[in-house]
């Protein structure tokens, strides 16, 4: 099925590179966190994040979404983690300033990340890429403006469009997120975010916040 809001597989610039690195990216992470599924602790993505007009609360349970950082959008490379994640650091450094942000992204079991947009990319000059590393079987997925995407291949999207995640399985999900400039990905410019720019998007019931209208 053709998607309007998502680039998938070979539509993603550098897809072959990302696929080739998947085993090493996962191996580094598991070596650093052998208890990944049963006890390893990571930094929680802030629970309150988004401006008026979008969900103020980001997910259904505090710390449902966690990150193991490689490059911060404001503070740059998080070099203290280089020994743990050598493949990810090599990848990010190869892109230089064209990479705005990168990190391992963990979604907890039975978690919903409500619809949101990326506060770090308001000018929409970057595109967010998902490199799937461990995806549980079962009821799990991702949507952008109602278009459903599975983590069966690399994909990218404009994170200024409303998007959400659900993981109705007993396991954690792991992907590497990397934000690259649209220019290096040979993509045309995208409009910058502005208040109300997503007001036209219909509700997506599967991840709808029951406390938000």
Where are these regions (language model features)?
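Ligand-binding loop in jelly-roll beta-barrel domains
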Residues: 161-176
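Short coil/turn motifs at secondary-structure junctions
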Residues: 136, 164, 181-185
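Basic nucleic-acid-binding interfaces
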Residues: 131
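Trp-centered recognition loops
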Residues: 124-128, 150-151
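Fe(II)/2-oxoglutarate oxygenase catalytic core
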Residues: 1-125, 134, 138, 144, ...
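Short, solvent-exposed aromatic-acidic interface loops
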Residues: 145-148, 181-182
């Amino acid at each position: 099925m053709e998607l309007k809001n998502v680039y998938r597989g070979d539509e993603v610039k550098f897809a072959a590179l990302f696929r080739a690195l998947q085993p090493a990216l996962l191996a580094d992470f598991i070596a650093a966190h052998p208890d990944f599924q049963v006890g390893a602790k990571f930094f929680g993505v802030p629970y309150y994040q988004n401006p008026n007009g979008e969900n103020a609360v980001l997910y259904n349970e505090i710390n449902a979404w966690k990150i193991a950082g490689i490059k911060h959008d404001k503070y740059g490379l998080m070099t203290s983690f280089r020994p743990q994640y050598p493949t990810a650091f090599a990848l990010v450094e190869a892109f230089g300033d064209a990479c705005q942000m990168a990190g391992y992204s963990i979604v907890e079991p039975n978690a919903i990340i409500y619809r949101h947009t990326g506060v770090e990319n308001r000018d929409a000059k970057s595109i967010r890429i998902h490199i799937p590393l461990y995806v549980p079987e079962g009821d799990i997925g991702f949507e952008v403006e109602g278009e459903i995407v599975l983590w069966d291949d690399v994909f990218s999207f404009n994170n200024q469009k409303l998007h959400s995640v659900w993981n109705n399985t007993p396991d954690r999900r792991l992907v590497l997120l990397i934000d690259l400039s649209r220019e290096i990905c040979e993509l045309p410019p995208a409009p910058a975010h502005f208040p109300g720019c997503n007001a036209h998007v219909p509700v997506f019931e599967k991840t709808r916040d029951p406390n938000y209208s």
